[in-house]
Structures are given as C-alpha cells and as structure tokens.
C-alpha cells in the first residue's frame, strides 16, 4: 500500500500521519495481525470528526479548505504548517481561484506551557500563516485572561522571515474560528488549532 492511498495522509502530504501509519502497522504486525488486515485498517481509516476529532479533520466550507487539529506545541504546529503549505500548493486552479491563495490559522495553546514555548509557538505560526487569529483555551491553567495570547503575539512579532501580514486576537475559540472563516476566500486554506472540539 502506497501512502497516498491512506486517507489520513491526504495523498502523502501529511507526513506525520505517514509516520503514524507506519508505527501502527509495525505494532499490529508485531502483535500477529495479518498484512491484509493491516492494509484494510489503514486504507479504511478516515480522519473524520466522528472517528478522530481534532486530528487533521478536513471540512470544506463555501470553497474554503478547512482543517481542525490540536497542534498545541511548536513541533506539532510545524508539522501541520508543512502539511498545509503542501496542500495549498497542490490545489488545482478553479473558477474560485484568487491571485494568491492564503493560509489562515486560528492559533492557541494551553496555559501550562513555559513562556518561551508559547512564544516559540507564535514564531512558528508566523512561518506558515498569512493571517493569524490568536485565541485562548477556556481553561487557562493558571494564566490570566489574555496572557497566553500576548505571548503568542510576541512570538509572531519576533519572526523576521514570516508569512504573516495580519494578526488579530479574539480570545473566544468559537468566535475566533468564525472570524477566520469570515476573512477566508474560496480557495484559501484555514486551520483551527482547536481545544474545545464539541464547541467547534
């Protein structure tokens, strides 16, 4: 089975899910699973809202290519960002095409991270998103309202070679996602780093 046949890899573009599939296949094989069963499991698994909420769920809304993923640290965001830019590059031209398709991100993380890790998340986000909407988790884990958002914004401003042209802070996760969708044009890619999956 080639990785582009595995729906969770989005044609092999989601490299982290290629690695996840390899690990799952190896573990299953080590436990005695037959190869045809492993193949069926990997090719039949769809990263839908029902089967794996917050794990690279793809949702198209009025021509906007939306994804929801946790990606709550810089390493996870880098993997997500690389996937998103690869996905963006692979989109076919259509009547909805715009001069420059954008990558829009709703970015947030938990408050129990170190300040430098939250700042690094902001720097990483600026590498991949043209527009960033900064949000906060409802459960701030010991932080003051707006504190995590301020650290993310600091990181975004520290990225000298970033893509970001616009940054907005909307603390409420659902409102941030709605605002991001209102900014998006058909053909844009929108990623929401979600926390409250039921609310989204």
What is the role of each PLM region?
Residues 7, 11-16, 23-36, 40-200:
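ATP-dependent carboxylate-amine ligase
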